[in-house]
Amino acid sequence: MQGRAIWAEGPIHSFDLPSSSLERGGQALKSGASKTHAYMDEEVGTSTAEAWTWIVPSLSFIQGFMAGQAVLLMLFLGLFRYFFMTSSPGTRAQQQADLLQRVHAVRTSMDMRSHVPPYARVPYEQGVQACVQDLLSQVRYDPSEHAPESLDWLNVLVAQLLMSYRMSILNAGMCAGRNEDMDEPALPSTANAEKTAAKLALERVLNEAMQGRATKHFLDRLVVTDIDMGCRYPTFSHARVRPALHAKSTLVEIDFEYMDALTLGIDTRMWLHFPQWRFGSLAANLCMRVERFAGTLVLEIGTLPEPTPVQARVCLHPNFVLDAHLSTILGSKSKLQDVPKIEELFLARLRSWLEHNVVWPHFWHIPLPGIGTSPADPLA
């Protein structure tokens, strides 16, 4: 049979195959390989199609969900626009009618929810004097019959305020003392930690204030030699209400008294710049002590006859009492001590300053927070 090899013990004999048989065999192999590749391509295509069948439905669901939400939102906006909004403002009369309707509805609802008895007051258009009389009647205060009141509660508040100021001065001085070298002689102002802290704080304030004045060329650095911020507190009593002179408001008169030993001692040098710069200096040491300050304090809140912002005005009656003493030493070699004229001039200048700033008819104006004032207004 052709195409078969015969194996025997003897030598191997081969038969030659015709060329047509070889060609038919090669074509068979090629057709088998092409069928194999076609089958593999069919399998891959089937898996890819199955994957897309899972992806496409998920994308369609998200798109449909978003479209549904958009439709609901547009429907809600349309209904809101139709029921609660208007396309045009309308005429002025219609706007006013709508405003009155809204205000009436809100006012009616508020009256139904709250149960407040009706209050009546004098309209402001009747004048300030009528309003003041109405004010006194509402607070049940008759100035002609009401007895002076004690101010124990005010004494406690003022004492706490003064104590807070004293503690803040001491804290500021302690903070400044950490950065300064205390290589100074033993002075009365350094007798204890509190005086030392107050000395440092006051020296810093005084010397900084002297920098912007013309006297800085004539005065040397100020050294606080003695200081005592006191240990007592002022007392207020006999508060009474009085009508103001211009009949535009009322004022409160309060008697006060402060007895303590407020002490301040300063040492410096006064320079003479003639005929040359720093030709000579005059040493000066001053110590002032205030022992008693008493009088009548007047407090008035309101507006003046002319249109001004609301403010509080404070002044003293002219019969105030100020008991103070001043000790001085001038000179380095030959010293002038406790010259009476210097004490008289200094205390007279202090009293004159008080009379021209806080003694009636001069007031110390305290601006109060205003409504409707511009930020640029210094009194606002």
UniProtKB/Swiss-Prot annotation:
UniProt GO cellular component terms: endoplasmic reticulum membrane; ERMES complex
Protein origin, superkingdom: Eukaryota
CDD domains reported for this sequence: SMP_Mmm1
Location of the protein in the cell: Endoplasmic reticulum membrane
Domain remark from Swiss-Prot or TrEMBL: The SMP-LTD domain is a barrel-like domain that can bind various types of glycerophospholipids in its interior and mediate their transfer between two adjacent bilayers.
Similarity remark: Belongs to the MMM1 family.
Protein name per its UniProtKB record: Maintenance of mitochondrial morphology protein 1
Classification of source organism: Eukaryota, Fungi, Dikarya, Basidiomycota, Ustilaginomycotina
Gene giving rise to this polypeptide: MMM1
